[in-house]
Amino acid sequence: VQENSVANAWEGVSGGAYDAVAAECVALKKALGLNDWGYYDLVRTLADGFCGPKTNESVVLQSFLMAEAGYKVRMARGGGRLFLLLATDGQVYARPYFNIDGQVFYILDDVPRAASYNICNFTIPGERPLSLAMPAPPLFAQKPAAPAVRNFDGVVSTTVTVNRNLMDFYTNYPPCHWSIYAATALTAPVRGQLYPPLRAAVAGKGEREAAELLLHYLHRAFPYKTDEAQFGVERTLFAEEMYYYPYSDCEDRSILFARLVKDLLGLDVVLLYYPAHIATAVCFKGEVKGDYMQLGNKRYVICDATYIGCLLYTSPSPRDRQKS
């Protein structure tokens, strides 16, 4: 692939023939409530459909449509093919990346890597990085998955049916920081199924007792398995995916527990990273004894959603605690 052929292809797509397509893509992004990553996924799917999956022509069309929407894009040549490079506002794991003029760009598509790359560097006024944050889940058509029944020793039982279309979208999400997963809300249909029985279970309880019940729900109702054992690779789940996949590990449970505590108890939470482990810490309004982290003027009591029977503890030692 020669540089002049790339320039000619860019001139071809930017000459006005695809302006209506670009406008329709932006309109569809709004209609579906897509975040920036969702828009890229839409553009990639459309371009692959028009031009053939993972072809050079598809990459050129993707770069034009993303640039037209204001995103910071570049292209690279290597191994006889073109690659789309996208700047993001946060780190993406397990993807090739390039530092171009102080900005990190990633190859987000799952394509074979080249031995070396030549960057086609250009700038467009007003361009911005792609955000990985998801202010709200996308509004996909409903395609019900099998109902997931989660039972905590007869104390509380939940039955949740998630949207398989949303699960497919989450499956393709680029691996990124846990804060992105933790900040993503549950969809309204899932909240409508999940929250009534949980609210009934914590009704009339104090903060600590209510948090402990939610914690034991995570301990007892969700079988544990490492990502390597379940998926073959490291993978963090969005909270809603806990009702789609049969197993979960420490960060998945911590993310769902944080979401339940925020939504049902109205308490502030943070995630804590230990070597090879993640836990949650809760800022209780009343006095709750236990190990804690002080952040500013707030005291966050450490809670662990992985080790059976634990609400508060001194250290997350796998030698001393059984994983659920």
Regions from the PLM with identified roles:
Residues 292-306:
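Catalytic Cys-His active-site segments of thiol-dependent hydrolases/isopeptidases
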Residues 49-62, 225-285:
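Active-site neighborhood of thiol-dependent amide/isopeptide-bond enzymes
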Residues 4-43, 180-244, 306:
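Secondary-structure boundary elements
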Residues 284-287, 306-308:
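Solvent-exposed coil/turn segments that connect beta secondary-structure elements
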Residues 71-186:
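Extended, non-transmembrane interaction/recognition domains
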Residues 313-322:
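Conserved small/polar residues in nucleotide/adenosyl-binding loops
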Residues 65, 69-73, 198, 202, ...:
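Sec/Tat-exported extracytoplasmic proteins
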Residues 1-123:
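Mixed-charge, low-complexity segments
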